[in-house]
């Protein structure tokens, strides 16, 4: 699995990378703008990401805008929503209303509330069919 981890917090990026150790190869980005550029480059190189783990609150371009941009790029390439890259959004917002708004607005495959645990991440990846390992 080829993954892009996007978070402006270095510790957050490193923690997710540690959780994915042995499950995926990964790149990192510090904001939405960099994520979009890395996504474009991965597609151009013929090795597109299978998964993007994307924080919502970031400088320059937030996670909502990055996800919308990536989905728009997929649409322009004729990729149907069910065949697009899996995007897991991360957010500190934890009320049901916030979770639904974040999930829908970012057009994500899944949503995780921070702090993210290894078990929650692996369970989410399992539900998305990206891994078959038990947590």
Question: Which residues does each predicted region cover?
Answer:
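A Lys-centered signature of the CheY-like receiver
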Residues: 113-114
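Helix N-cap/capping motif at the beta->alpha junctions
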Residues: 28-41, 63
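Conserved sequence signature across two-component system core domains
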Residues: 6-7, 29, 52
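Receiver (REC) domain active-site loop signature in two-component systems and cognate sites
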Residues: 58, 70
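Hydrophobic/aromatic residues positioned on beta-strands within the core alpha/beta folds
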Residues: 90-91
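Active-site beta3 strand of CheY-like receiver
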Residues: 43-53
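Two-component/phosphorelay signaling modules centered on CheY-like receiver
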Residues: 10-28, 106
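Alpha4 helix (beta4-alpha4-beta5 surface) of REC/receiver domains from two-component response regulators
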Residues: 65, 77, 82-85, 94-110, ...
């Amino acid at each position: 699995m080829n993954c892009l981890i996007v978070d402006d917090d270095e510790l957050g990026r490193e923690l997710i990378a540690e959780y994915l150790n042995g499950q995926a190869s990964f790149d990192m980005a510090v904001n939405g703008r960099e994520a979009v550029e890395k996504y474009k480059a991965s597609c151009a190189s013929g090795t597109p990401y299978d998964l993007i783990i994307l924080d919502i609150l970031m400088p320059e371009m937030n996670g909502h805008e990055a996800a919308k941009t990536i989905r728009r790029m997929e649409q322009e390439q004729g990729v149907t929503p069910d065949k697009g890259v899996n995007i897991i959004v991360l957010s500190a917002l934890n009320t049901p209303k916030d979770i639904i708004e974040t999930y829908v607005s970012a057009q994500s495959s899944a949503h995780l509330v921070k702090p993210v645990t290894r078990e929650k991440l692996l369970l989410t990846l399992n539900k998305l069919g990206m891994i078959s390992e038990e947590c």
